[in-house]
Amino acid sequence: MFFAVITLFPEMFEAITAYGISGRAAKRDIVQVTCINPRDFAEGNYRRVDERPFGGGPGMVMMAEPLAKAINHAKQLASQAGCVHVPVVYMSPQGKTLNEQAVQQFVDYDGLIVLCGRYEGVDERLIQHYVDQEWSIGDYVLSGGELPAMVLLDSIIRRLPNVMSDEQSAIQDSFVDGLLDCPQYTKPDQFEGLDVPEILKSGHHANIEKWRFLQRYQRTLERRPELIEQVTLTKQQKKWLSDEQG
């Protein structure tokens, strides 16, 4: 999958390309992550990419022209890589909140061009003409779009085929089917007086699967009850709940 990131701080994305699951995916050429600095497309000796906002007010606004040139360059690179469906995504607190369903849709794309804002944001005309989607990672403000962009890339990359060493691990993640994940345990059997649930050591896979589902359902009900209404349960899961509730 092709990713082009428009950012003033390309070095930050070594966190994606050099480490962990996403780093291994990059080394294996499952993903291509290219960072494009809009300063390279700015004019003048200082290569400015920001200016004071019209109408006054605090801070600076990123200028449309260097960003547009950077996006067009990214589109050329995507075309050279054989990618057809490559939307431009702007990471913004004003965008829709990212969730697992959106991530799964991104997985089906050929690639993404991700725009990282800075300062007070981006000239609205650039958004109107070049941005296809705006996404947020939550109702709070960060110093720039780089961290949200890394969240987006990591969440997509780990869902791509052949990226995870254990495909089942990704399938069982929180939110994949609308439920939170179940509690996880590893060695030792006892830690500070707390034991691993016996059922997890029983080797009875069907009972373990049932236990994990019931734990996930109960945890979601307690911590994120608004998610329960959106969950579609299988026939087996409904039976497990019915048995548990007597």
UniProtKB/Swiss-Prot annotation:
It is an enzyme of class 2 (transferase). It comes from Acinetobacter baumannii (strain ACICU). Keywords: Cytoplasm, Methyltransferase, S-adenosyl-L-methionine, Transferase, tRNA processing. It is found in: Cytoplasm. The gene is trmD. One of its GO terms (cellular component) is cytosol. Pfam families: tRNA_m1G_MT (PF01746). S-adenosyl-L-methionine binds at G117, I137, G138, D139, Y140, V141, L142. Homodimer. One of its GO terms (molecular function) is tRNA (guanine(37)-N1)-methyltransferase activity. Specifically methylates guanosine-37 in various tRNAs. Its EC number is 2.1.1.228. It comes from the Bacteria. Belongs to the RNA methyltransferase TrmD family. This is tRNA (guanine-N(1)-)-methyltransferase. It catalyses: guanosine(37) in tRNA + S-adenosyl-L-methionine = N(1)-methylguanosine(37) in tRNA + S-adenosyl-L-homocysteine + H(+). One of its GO terms (biological process) is tRNA N1-guanine methylation. The lineage of its organism: Bacteria, Pseudomonadati, Pseudomonadota, Gammaproteobacteria, Moraxellales. InterPro entries: Alpha/beta_knot_MTases (IPR029028), tRNA_m1G_MeTrfase_C_sf (IPR023148), tRNA_m1G_MeTrfase_TrmD (IPR002649), tRNA_m1G_MTases_N (IPR029026), tRNA_MeTrfase_TRMD/TRM10 (IPR016009).
